[in-house]
Regions:
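Short amphipathic alpha-helical interaction segments
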Residues: 49-53, 135-151
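Eukaryotic partner-binding/assembly regions in large regulatory complexes
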Residues: 1-81
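Short, amphipathic alpha-helical interaction segments positioned at domain boundaries
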Residues: 87, 171-207
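A short, conserved structural fragment
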Residues: 61-67, 150-161
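Short alpha-helical segments that sit at the start of domains
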Residues: 79-115
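Long, low-complexity, intrinsically disordered segments
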Residues: 206-215
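Accessory beta->alpha helical hairpin/"wing" motif in late/C-terminal subdomains of nucleic-acid enzymes
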Residues: 75-77, 156-181
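Short acidic, hydrophobic short linear motifs in intrinsically disordered regions
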Residues: 34-42, 109-128
Length: 215
């Protein structure tokens, strides 16, 4: 006699296939998926529980899927081919490095199980001023830069960035923004981040428009 699968089993299989497609597409569009963010948690858990299947989807394309357990709780889609990585504009890179630095500083003072790292626009502007940049980032420019970082699941604004006390949630994925990060040594990574920021410093009066050039 031929063995027939139950409708319930068929629905479960279809749901699994759909989740694989949904998660794979999400990684392609956003590079990271986070277990600590409520609307991404199901996708992160799917990658965690079906890592081999997810990797099998991307392997023929030359991508690797890396899983970072707690405390990071992140899955990353990585392509090592030259020219295939996401390219950030100069001020996007600067903002990313500033948020990375602030994340490292804040994380040291938070409880190990803290889910959120929040920084204020004032803290961001203070770090930017140290770099002698040619202009202060206004609200519109900052919000435009944040759209890119949000797309790649690096950070997101908490509401409108309308004042110095407005907040930005910084995701642990900023730690993975620099290659070969030593995730166990926050002090070393802070120093490294400041070194990277130093490459963008400009003397007073330099004429550079925000957002020009690539990182």
């Amino acid at each position: 006699w031929r063995t027939l699968s139950s409708p319930a089993a068929g629905r479960k299989k279809m749901a699994t296939i759909n989740m694989l497609e949904e998660t794979a597409n999400y990684l392609l569009n956003h590079c990271f998926v986070l277990g600590g963010v409520e609307d991404q948690r199901a996708k992160y858990l799917y990658v965690q529980d079906h890592l081999d299947e997810v990797r099998a989807v991307f392997a023929p394309l030359g991508y690797s899927v890396l899983l970072y357990p707690a405390p990071l709780q992140a899955a990353a889609l990585v392509n090592g081919h030259e020219g295939s990585q996401a390219r950030l504009l100069k001020y996007e890179s600067i903002l990313l490095l500033v948020l990375r630095l602030l994340y490292l500083q804040k994380r040291e003072s938070l409880a190990a199980n803290a889910d959120e790292v929040l920084v204020t626009v004032e803290e961001v502007q203070t770090e930017l001023q140290k770099m002698n940049l040619p202009r202060r980032l206004d609200q519109k420019t900052l919000e435009n830069l944040m759209r890119t970082l949000r797309r790649y699941n690096l950070a997101r604004p908490v509401g409108r960035l309308s004042g110095l006390d407005s907040r930005i949630e910084v995701f642990p994925t900023v730690l993975l923004a620099l290659p070969d990060a030593d995730l166990a040594d926050a002090a070393a990574e802070s120093a490294r981040t400041r070194t990277e920021l130093g490459l963008y410093e400009r003397p007073e009066g330099a004429d550079t428009e925000a957002g020009e050039g690539e990182a």
